[in-house]
Amino acid sequence: MSEIREARLLKANSLINKGFEPYAETFKISHSTRFLNEKFGYLDNGQEFDLNVSLAGRVLAKRVMGKIAFFTITDQEGKIQLYLEKRIIDDYEINAKLLSFEDLKEIVDIGDWIGVFGTIKKTNKGELSIKVSKWEMLSKSLQPLPDKWHGLTDIEKRYRQRYLDLIVNPLSKTVFKTRAKCISLIRRWLDEKNFLEIETPILQSEAGGAEARPFITHHNTLDIPLYLRIATELHLKRMVVGGFEKVYELGRIFRNEGVSTKHNPEFTSVEIYQAFSNYIDMMNLTEDLIKNIVLSCCDSLVINYQDKVIDFSKPWKRISMKNVVKEYTGIDFDSFDGDLNKAKKFSEEINIEISPKINTLGRLLNEVFEQKVESQLIEPTFVTDYPIEISPLARRHPKNKEMVQRFELFIAGRELANAFSELIDPVDQRQRMQLQQSLRDAGDLEAHCIDEDFLQALEIGMPPTGGLGIGIDRLVMLLTNSSSIRDVIPFPLLKPELTSNKSEKSTSNEVK
């Protein structure tokens, strides 16, 4: 590797010695590769089109055959072939003191960025090309591009050096284009329905709105601890109290938790709050929004995900947590009449692992669901009516005070969205926050703290409100048929690599 770098440094310095800059300041582009391929793909073999174009890209392939060369370059939109002929380039070089054909052969390596000027030509073999009249070096690459991508080690390298992944793996570019499109579509859909995007604090004095461990930092001037937000919920609700009836925020969330194919400590979500609505209204909103995104990104409401076919076009199933647990496990939690020990016995018979934290029927119900049911929910399914003890910010269910008006959406065996009829009763909310605080004081680091300012806001008065959160990364996984959340996050969190303390020594051939 060092020998290749040394050779390329020599080439960069040879450009300098000839009076040319190996790292250009700017370059004027007239067209993209995508435009040219779409506009002139109709040309017959051997046909030329007299349109002057200038474009730039990274060299991916290089073939030199005597006085003719063929390069392939790529830009953000695609790739195109360059047809380079010594006679044409050298004619321009003599008159304008430009880089010659020999310079092109000797100095340009795969990985370099170059800019070219020329006209349109389709070769006799049917390859649309730029017939190059002159060229410029825009950025000399000192390291070679990788040749192969296979095996665990290379997967790790794709995540650590995403720039290399994007260069050699066109599918990765497609994934991140789809991600950008998805985010843009969500914002546009909400904006068109008169939702207002709000920016809430990332640094917060209290970490609330979810059961999760926060990242902790310290503000030096104020000499206080601060937390990276684990949700945007409580601040968005404050905006509803203040009179904004339809609000949302699409942004980054931080949770000091594990890393897996489904979890990254830093992730993207959209939270949406709509006054005068309940969780049924938010269910309808969720279905409409996600169907719109899927159709726009995939051109169909039926998609392939891994080895499954998922049909978004049918009405989505809606079923309570108790009923879906009964359907998949045979356990009827209504039959236990509040007897936790009896429920534990039935749960252990189907190999449920029960931790000491599972000390209520509601928590046990949720544990059975997560261990035995969740992974089997492939088609879009709204699971409704959650236990109150795991939903401290949701409104009680009018028909069962031990449950709340909450749903989670599951697709392909993963949670994709979470929503409530929001709890707007300040007395009930205080009691539940006090219970959460007692759990936190007893060592549960994921339990909520009491947020006095939020409780004060509720006492001012909050209208009936439905709230919803959607995980953007998991949605993009579905849209792009990606098996790991790391595939859809440009720079996922990774454990640092062990590196040598010795830095590479500079040589006399450094570009100067």
From Swiss-Prot:
It holds the Pfam family tRNA_anti-codon. Its EC number is 6.1.1.6. Mg(2+) 2 binds at residue 415. Binds 3 Mg(2+) ions per subunit. It is found in: Cytoplasm. GO terms for molecular function: ATP binding; lysine-tRNA ligase activity; magnesium ion binding; tRNA binding. Mg(2+) 1 binds at residues 408, 415. It catalyses: tRNA(Lys) + L-lysine + ATP = L-lysyl-tRNA(Lys) + AMP + diphosphate. HAMAP family: Lys_tRNA_synth_class2 (MF_00252). Homodimer. Belongs to the class-II aminoacyl-tRNA synthetase family. This is Lysine--tRNA ligase. It comes from Prochlorococcus marinus (strain MIT 9515). The lineage of its organism: Bacteria, Bacillati, Cyanobacteriota, Cyanophyceae, Synechococcales.
